[in-house]
């Protein structure tokens, strides 16, 4: 059996990589992918603690996070496609200048 520490270290590494992508990258698609990576790190943490405790609450929480991530991805990609069609670019600087 793999200790929970390994799962938590992997989740922390995934979350840090996602946070780095959100803070550093300028492309909206890469930022969305980084947010998804952070959500997957949270899922890994939920499932690891559920396995340690022996209950299903972590699995249910992970399914809920997956549903929220799917909705976020669908809405986010629709916004990115609309911005690309109107501006021709998906850089975050272009999104900041959309004030009318």
From Swiss-Prot:
Segments traversing the membrane: 4-24, 29-49, 63-83
Family matches, as Gene3D superfamilies: 1.10.287.3510
GO-annotated biological processes: ATP synthesis coupled electron transport
Reaction catalyzed: a quinone + NADH + 5 H(+)(in) = a quinol + NAD(+) + 4 H(+)(out)
Cysteine pairs bridged by disulfides in the record: none
Coarse class of the protein's main subcellular location: membrane
GO cellular component: NADH dehydrogenase complex; plasma membrane
Cross-referenced Pfam families: Oxidored_q2
Highest taxon listed in the record's lineage: Bacteria
Keywords noted in UniProt: Cell inner membrane, Cell membrane, Membrane, NAD, Quinone, Translocase, Transmembrane, Transmembrane helix, Transport, Ubiquinone
Subcellular location: Cell inner membrane
Record membrane topology: Multi-pass membrane protein
InterPro entries: NADH_UbQ_OxRdtase_chain4L/K, NUOK/Mnh_C1-like
GO MF, one example: NADH:ubiquinone reductase (non-electrogenic) activity
Function, in words: NDH-1 shuttles electrons from NADH, via FMN and iron-sulfur (Fe-S) centers, to quinones in the respiratory chain. The immediate electron acceptor for the enzyme in this species is believed to be ubiquinone. Couples the redox reaction to proton translocation (for every two electrons transferred, four hydrogen ions are translocated across the cytoplasmic membrane), and thus conserves the redox energy in a proton gradient.
Listed PANTHER family: NADH DEHYDROGENASE SUBUNIT 4L-RELATED (PTHR11434:SF21), NADH-UBIQUINONE OXIDOREDUCTASE SUBUNIT ND4L (PTHR11434)
Subunit relationships: NDH-1 is composed of 14 different subunits. Subunits NuoA, H, J, K, L, M, N constitute the membrane sector of the complex.
UniProt protein name: NADH-quinone oxidoreductase subunit K
